[in-house]
Amino acid sequence: MKLLGRKKSYGQDIETSDDNVGSEASLPDTLSRGSSTTAPKGRPTRKRDDADRRHTKKGPITPAPMTASEARARRKSLAPPKCHRAERRAKRAASKAQITDRRERMMAGEEAYLPPRDQGPVRRYIRDLVDARRNALGLFTPSALVLLFITFGVPQLQLYMSPAMLVLLSVMGIDGIILGRKISKLVDVKFPSNTESHWRLGLYAAGRASQMRRLRVPRPQVEHGSSVG
């Protein structure tokens, strides 16, 4: 008995479904698994560098110490050999002598031992010009100390300390400007090929002039009033 509107029989439907199941079973496993299989990268796997292999320790790992005494013994075995007291003293003495020698050479003005800001013939010439001149800038430290002691010793003079300090600073500023201009002109005459700015040369000269003579580094190589060519 046929139903209205039905073109295929029930038996034909069963056969069609069996054929579909058979065709799906005949597909390869790679297609049936779908996205579970990753496609090849197209390039070889990157290997570790030789340096990593050299630094990688091979072999069994040493177990951790179980007690504090084992930990102390392991640290003692891994520690470098200790130097005797006489060897340590000799090393300290040699290091101290080397530092002293380098400082003496720097204070003497040897070019190889000077800091970068003091190296060069231009800087040496500026130092000689400043050291041969009596500068008002060098009076800042002793004058400040004297004014400080007077302030604490005689409180009644505190009203006069501020104006005195302002006058001292003004004199120092004027002296620094005069010194910087003079140094720049003399450097241009002696070193025509100098490319360093006048501002930096003036600051270098003023900074050295503001220090006390015995505290200058390197120590002065000329006397007061000497002629510097």
Curated annotation (Swiss-Prot):
Domain of life, per lineage: Bacteria
Membrane-topology annotation of the record: Multi-pass membrane protein
Subcellular compartments: Cell membrane
The keyword Cell membrane belongs to this UniProt entry's keyword annotation: yes
Keywords of the record: Cell membrane, Membrane, Transmembrane, Transmembrane helix
TM segment ranges: 137-157, 159-179
Disulfide bond residue pairs: none
Annotated segments matching region Disordered: 1-102
One of the Pfam families matching this protein, by short name: DUF3043
Basic residues compositional bias, start-end: 73-94
UniProt cross-references to InterPro entries, sorted A to Z: DUF3043
Cellular component, GO annotation: plasma membrane
Listed name of the protein: Uncharacterized protein ML0869
Originating species: Mycobacterium leprae (strain TN)
